[in-house]
Each structure stands twice: as structure tokens, then as C-alpha cells.
């Protein structure tokens, strides 16, 4: 059963999206997949003169630490909504958040994201990830607005 996918980046908007998606998963008895995507490291411009091999490990991203942090957030939100938690899978990835969520949407009944994320620039109406997944996801998309 595909279920619900929710994108989480640690922002308040994504936390609200996570809580909403959990409630929906409980209500409809479907599994929930929580995905957090960390941006791929940008190679310094000095590589033009001193190339760095592509297979050099990135020391700034620790997938196990990221997975544990995401699981901690999921557990905390599950306690706050005080409902029986649905079947939850957590997943972390390195790359472009919109691209990863669009790819994941191919196997989902619904994709849930917050209206704005933790990016440095805010768009007029929606964050860039929520805007991109709205246009390219393979399943229905729910955009959760921030609290007031």
C-alpha cells in the first residue's frame, strides 16, 4: 500500500505538515513515509585549478545522524498529536529536495509539504520546493500553510 509521503526540512511549516500527515495516515489507516533531503555539497570554485575527485567523501553530511535526528522529530510530533501512530518509515537523502520528493511521489497516494521551508529565500506565495512539487508530482499534493 503506497500511503502518504511528507517532506520535512526542520522548519515550522514542515513540522505542521508532518503533524497533519500523521493524522491523515491514522484516519485512513495508511503508512506514512517521512523524507528529509539535505542539499548536495557545492564544490568550491578552486576546483577549476585543483580538481577534487568526485568520489571524495563529504564530511559535512552524516546520513546516520540525519536519520536519527529525523526519527527524533517524528517521535516528538507523534507524542504531541496524542494519537496511535501510523506505520512510519523515515528516509534521508542527499540531493535536490523537490526532485527527490517528485520521484518519491510516483509510489504515493498523497504528498504533503509545508508552504515554506528552511531555505534562505522566501517566495511570495510558496516556497520553491512546494511550488515545484505542486507542478511535477505524480500524485495529489497537499500544501500545509504555516500557523498564525
State the predicted function of each range.
Residues 53-72:
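A short acidic, glycine-rich active-site loop
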Residues 36, 115-116, 145-146:
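Short secondary-structure boundary segments
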Residues 72-89:
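A structural motif corresponding to the C-terminal end of an alpha-helix
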